[in-house]
Amino acid sequence: MKTTTQIVHLLCAFCVVCFCIIQIFMKIRRPNMQELHQEVDEFVPDSCTKKMPKIGISANRNSEFQSCIAEQYVQAVLKAGGAPVLIPVITDIAALTAVVDSLDGLLMSGGADINPLYLNEEPIPQLQDVDTYRDEFDLMLIRLAANRQIPIMGICRGHQLMNAAFGGTLYQDIYSQHNEPVLKHSQKMPRNQASHSVTLEDGRKIGVNSIHHQSVAKLAQEFVETAVAPDGINEGMRHQEKYIFSVQWHPEHLTDDSEPYSLQLFQKLIKYAELYSRAKDLHNRIVTIDSHTDTPMIFPGEFNLGKKEGGKVNLPYMEEGKIDAVFMVAYIPQGKRDDESLDAARNLAINRINEIKRQEKINPSRMGIAYSTEDLLHLKRQNKKAVFIGIENGYALGKNLQNISMFKEMGVSYITLCHNGDNDICDSARGKGEWGGLSPFGKEVVAEMNRLGIMIDLSHAAESTFYDVLECSTAPVIASHSSVRSLCDHPRNLTDEQLKAIARKGGVVQLCLYKGFINKDSEKASLSDAIRHLEYMINLIGIDHVGIGSDFDGDGELIGCRSTNELINITMRLLELGYSDSDIEKIWGGNLLRVMKEVQGERNQVN
């Protein structure tokens, strides 16, 4: 039996060996201040090398409640090509927001059990140590990053916490709560050795390490299982549409050449972070516009765009998603056409426009009302968001051409000629064909809108109306929120011939994100479906005639793109598909602004 002295000597020798290994692992060199300063001062980044994306790593807390992280997380991020940044465990939202705003990607690390109270569950006896303060920190991080569409990767506890944050459930203890016989998931062997297999989404089997007793029970909505253990325990997931994924094992310990999949996980995070970094930079340089939102419709009284008050479009969302401008429309539902009803429709439009304009008064440091391209560019230089004004449904005009001048003076940039029903101007795509296209009054409306420099919006119009307008209008037209009928057979969508006709006229078609116009199975409508519509239009009519008109707050939303802060996901997809910065600039507003300038220039020529 070894004496106490021998044991101490052995421990000291072990510590020396560990210290030497760590020095080699971390490349610690002989201390020399002069050489160190010289190396730093002479370093010049290679202009041909991609910028390293900044990856925030959520810190753990040790027994003394100090923020710390295992070195393997840092080295794995470095090896994959990222610049790791440790995020200390704090719960000051303002400070965390400042940190998250600087990131390109987020890595949620492992650690202790999760407090079940966050999932509205009482603790069971098998629950082990929890750190509720760290839970709060991690959940804040996930929420802040997800709101900004920052790519997120989770590991072990991070995997479980992400599932909980997005609405899934957890086993507090798999050994007592999982119905089937369970493997040993808390290995005693070194973490750089695999202890059991998992089956991946593509059917491959790989070996993984396993250090946990909690796990995902029910996957969060919109997530797909990407790995499963032989006992049925979930080992990995990804969001259907967003750049978010996680695994139950610890791949940071398995990044050698023996199992490439673990390193590939970190490389995936870096790839996604590079896309996000490029998208952020691009949105900062170009002008981004959503050409159709119905936000004023959802508020029964006064509202404040400066707050997140329940809608899908507001200034915080625009700031998070780096969207410069939105068109907010005064939506007027089609009603009766007697004088009293027409007056009521006009007054509703006036009230909604005034409520839009009031937003500038209550948020003067964050936004302004824009009436032209120049206004928008001026606001962007001031770091403010822009709101353009539109009217959805010419029903608001009644039978009086003078109303067009009045709305022009109020700042209206476009008018959608009709909505779901024929009116005194024209036939609707959902109407009864009352006029066979434009009415006589409708032809006067087109001429007057041309004269005043108001864009004509053909979304919702019947095909007969559509072609009548193209024949009568002297200026290009827009479809502020329309999709492709060849991909989703809906009367509101545009045929290939209609798409081509708008392009020939010099106009632009703004892709609508309403799920019923994107996929016949509307509940499955996704960002991927929208990208297919967008690419279809680009291939058919060219990059110069397409844009984005979300229809948010008018039922527009898709899996992967449900509100203004999520629109940057479109940019990331387009970058991933290989579209150039100049192409994306056209899609995000360049094309629409070209048409607006031409239409407003048409007014100047006439006048």
Model-predicted regions and their roles:
Residues 208-215, 246-251, 288-295, 412, ...:
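Histidine-centered catalytic micro-motifs
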Residues 53-54, 83, 151, 169, ...:
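Proline-centered loop/turn at the N-terminus of a beta-strand
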Residues 3, 9-13, 18-155, 164, ...:
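N-terminal beta1-alpha1 cap of cysteine-dependent amidohydrolase-like domains
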Residues 80, 109, 148, 165, ...:
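Structural motif
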Residues 278-434, 489-499, 503-548, 552-607:
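N-terminal hydrophobic targeting/anchoring segments and the immediately downstream early-domain regions
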Residues 57, 107-108, 328, 417, ...:
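Redox-cofactor binding/interface segments in oxidoreductases and associated redox assembly factors
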Residues 396-398, 409-492:
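Divalent metal-binding pocket/active-site signature
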